[in-house]
Structure formats: structure tokens, C-alpha cells
Amino acid sequence: MSNKKVQSPKEESIAKMLICKVHIGTKNLENKMKRYVYTRAKDGVHIINLAKTYEKLQLAARVIVAVSNPADVVVVSARPFGSRAVLKFAQYTGAQAIAGRWTPGMLTNQIIQKFIEPRLLIVTDPRTDAQSVKESAYANIPVIALCDSDSPLEHVDIAIPCNNKGKESIALMYWLLAQEVLYLKGSIPRSQAWDVMVDMFLWRDPEQFELKNLANEEATPTAPHLADNQYATDAPYDDWNKKDDWNDNANEEWKNPIAVDEW
């Protein structure tokens, strides 16, 4: 009989956060983020309290579920590492995803074609997504943000303290948030593990795929080279000037001319 202790959902989630380095902050510290910092390492990097990260994650999931129409939730990531994560989050929760550059005026300028009126905004980084956070303040739209130790909390309603610069950390945070949303909606029971892996939310560099394909092409074995003088032997020049008698090997029937009276 195994003596292995069964982990609670909180312990399991925090263990995954440690693996993906969610707790690793930056050397800079925003004054309003002090409450989420556990300690400071010898190298000056601030360590985030993952217990508070888990609590804020649960709170954010409940706010997302409270929005009746999932399409009224907009997930934004100007950071490349979060582009795939927000697209996958939107796919599984029904939200809208905006990966890449934010068009100015999407929340405030009704004339532009991309104008939207969401009820909730989720951003990957309040610093890189500052334009969308600022517009949400004008439009009175609540904001949920993944905040690092140096992230500004201005106009942010719910801050989820985490490492928002690592691709593994961003992927795991959106995966955990999507999983909790599906649990609260009843799409999957809590007794059942979500069959979607975190790798699906992980950003992949297209250049790495191209380099990998080139390496595979170079490693592919080619046809063996022809042996020396195989199929490539030059014909002797004497044969071209040699005069042969075509009747030497011919049958007697073909040598004799046809009689005229046979026609």
C-alpha cells in the first residue's frame, strides 16, 4: 500500500507553479505589490507568495464566470509569449482574444471598425498592455491583470501576482484560470482532471520550427553516389570510325536478293 499523500487542488496547483517558475519576480518592486512578495533572494530577485497567487486566481475565475455572455470577456496580450495562451484561453472559455498590437481607440472610439464594448478585460502585463488598461478606465470596464513584482497597479481591479515574463509561467496561469472557469461553469467535474495539457498554452517560436525542419532535411539520407565509371564509361573513339559489314551475322535468307519474278 502506498503511503503517498494525496495533494489537495491548492497544493497541486502551487506545485505546478513552482515548476513553471511562477514565483520568480524581478529585482524591482512596485510599492503596491509589496503585499504579494514573500521574500527577497540574495541576488535581489523578489519571490512571490504563491498562496496569494492561488487566492487571486480563484477570485478572478469567479468574476469571469459572473459575466453571463462569455464573449463579453476580452483577453489581451501584446507580449509574444502570451499570444498563444490568450488564444487557447478564449477557445476553451468562449472569450474574445486580442493577441499582438492593441489598436488605440478600441474601447473609446466608436467610429473605428474594431470598436468593442466588453464587460471584462484580462491583460497579460499591465505595462505592455498599458493602452488597453488606460482605455478600460475611460470606459469603466473592470480589469484583471497578471502582475509581476514591478507591475503598476493603476486602473487594475484584480491583480494576480505571478511571473508575467516567462512563457512557461504565462501558459500555466492561463491554463489554471481556464480550468477553474470550466470547473465553476460545470463543464467538467472537479473529480475529473482536465484532459488539456499545459503544453497547448505554451508559446512556440516559429523560427525554431523552421530550423528544426531544415535540420531534418539535412539529416535525410540521399541516394548513394554512383560508383566510379558506373554508367559513365566513355565509348572508345575507334568504334566510331570502324567499318563493319552488316551482312556478317545475317542469315542466308536475308543476304540473298529477292527475285524479280516473285513480285
Curated annotation (Swiss-Prot):
Highest taxon of source: Eukaryota
GO annotation terms (biological process): ribosomal small subunit assembly; translation
Gene Ontology cellular component terms for the protein in this record: cytosolic small ribosomal subunit
Coiled-coil features, chain-numbered ranges: none
Database matches in NCBIfam families: uS2_euk_arch (TIGR01012)
Subunit architecture: Component of the small ribosomal subunit. Mature ribosomes consist of a small (40S) and a large (60S) subunit. The 40S subunit contains about 33 different proteins and 1 molecule of RNA (18S). The 60S subunit contains about 49 different proteins and 3 molecules of RNA (25S, 5.8S and 5S). Interacts with ribosomal protein S21.
UniProt record similarity statement: Belongs to the universal ribosomal protein uS2 family.
Functional description taken from the UniProt entry: Required for the assembly and/or stability of the 40S ribosomal subunit. Required for the processing of the 20S rRNA-precursor to mature 18S rRNA in a late step of the maturation of 40S ribosomal subunits.
Protein name (Swiss-Prot/TrEMBL): Small ribosomal subunit protein uS2
